[in-house]
Design a protein with these regions (language model features):
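Catalytic nucleophile-loop/oxyanion-hole region of alpha/beta-hydrolase
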Residues: 95-96, 121-156, 160, 331-337
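Short beta-strand/loop motif that positions the catalytic acidic residue
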Residues: 285, 291-293
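Conserved alpha/beta-hydrolase
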Residues: 103-126
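Alpha/beta-hydrolase-fold enzymes
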Residues: 170-255
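Conserved alpha/beta-hydrolase "acid-adjacent" motif
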Residues: 298-304
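Short beta-strand element of the alpha/beta-hydrolase
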Residues: 82-91
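N-terminal cap/lid segment of alpha/beta-hydrolase-fold proteins
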Residues: 39-81, 330-331
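The serine-hydrolase catalytic nucleophile loop
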Residues: 91-105, 118, 303
Length: 355
């Protein structure tokens, strides 16, 4: 009797496993499956080549596992000795060109800035294009820090990190892994991908979640089989199939996207991001952290901010704003946030007798 039960159980489990494999293959190989495109009419953007004098910015590159990463190094005027440096990159799908408003402000405050594009995005190399994969982006941040420390113009013991949204989580994880980081500024950071996904499910519904899962599975399995990637929009109107399905997100990117921003990403990131929980690393951070959070952030529940504050303890400086996720990039909210960041970096990157 026991033997029969074991055999039947094994057959049932094998059947379930086979059905799952068949489902994945069908999802991956079924022809003519695509996500509706979201054509983004971009604003005028930032005329970077005109606004930034060549003597204030250098084009530099460094490599990660044989792939060249494109970066810009900004140095403060009148530099006579190694200076502190801020290492930074954008959030979900953003490029270094879109961070110019922050970079020039930090540079004017006397700091060097190394801003880079992740592999597969912007002006960096790597195939497939538009691959957003969290472990790779964390490697890129670590490599950028190492490169900054190797520069003769930079004080290797005064390297800080800046991140926003998805990269706001990256800089916290990077600081948890690298005890030499001097300080971290994380703006509207992704702290808990699972909590953010649950909030997204509540806002957009189960149909959206199931459609997103199907597209993510298709791309992931196709990558295992060596097939071309399956892509979905990064940003779309509320209710559309996009990684950021939100009218405010759409309006922000329409206003601010750079000419090298491409509104699509390999769909597999949707299966990677919900497991990403930087909040679980915060107990390992041993440097000052500025957390600027938005009370109406679609990706950051207030309970997660409270958890982050508890785990960071005395290292945390938390500033909450009664605004949405994308408001912090605009107008007076941007000015308030960036001025606080300059104050924070100046305090922790400059010795009291050096500025």
């Amino acid at each position: 009797m026991l033997y029969t039960v074991i055999v039947l159980t094994g057959m049932v489990l094998a059947g379930i496993a086979a059905a799952f494999v068949i489902e994945l293959l069908v999802v991956a190989l079924f022809p003519n499956v695509s996500a509706p495109g979201q054509h983004l009419t971009k604003g005028k953007g930032l005329p970077l080549k005109e606004l930034v004098p060549s003597d204030r910015r250098r084009d530099v590159t460094f490599e990660v596992e044989g792939t060249s990463i494109s970066a810009w190094l900004y140095l403060p005027r009148g530099q006579s000795s190694p200076v502190p440096c801020i290492v930074m990159a954008h959030g979900l799908g953003g490029t270094k060109k879109m961070l110019e408003p922050y970079v020039t402000r930090f540079q004017d405050a006397g700091m060097a800035v190394l801003v880079f594009d992740y592999r597969y995005l912007g002006e960096s190399n790597g195939e497939p294009r538009q691959l957003i994969w969290i472990p790779y982006q964390l490697q890129d941040y670590a490599a950028a820090v190492a490169y900054a420390r190797s520069l003769k113009e930079v004080d290797a013991d005064r390297v800080g990190l800046w991140g926003t949204s998805l990269s706001g989580g990256h800089v916290l994880v990077t600081a948890a892994r690298d005890g030499r980081i001097a300080c971290v500024s994380a703006q509207c950071p992704l702290l808990d991908g699972l909590a953010a996904s649950e909030q997204q499910l509540h806002r957009l519904g189960i149909r959206y979640a199931l459609r997103m899962l199907g597209h993510a599975q298709r791309d992931l399995v196709r990558s295992w089989l060596g097939l071309s990637p399956h892509k979905i929009p990064i940003v779309g109107r509320t209710g559309s199939l996009a990684l950021m399905s939100d009218d405010d997100a759409w309006d922000f990117f329409a206003e601010s996207a750079s000419d090298d921003f491409v509104n699509e990403a390999c769909a597999r990131i949707a299966m990677n991001i919900y497991r990403y929980r930087p909040v679980d690393h915060l107990h390992q951070v041993r440097c000052p952290v500025l957390l600027q959070t938005c009370d109406h952030d679609f990706a950051l529940p207030s309970k997660v901010v409270d958890k982050a504050a508890s785990r960071l303890g005395a290292f945390a400086e938390i500033v909450r704003y009664p605004i949405g996720h994308f408001d912090i990039y605009r107008g007076s909210h941007f000015e308030t946030a960036v001025n606080r960041q300059i104050e924070f970096f100046s305090k922790h990157l400059f010795p009291t007798d050096s500025k």
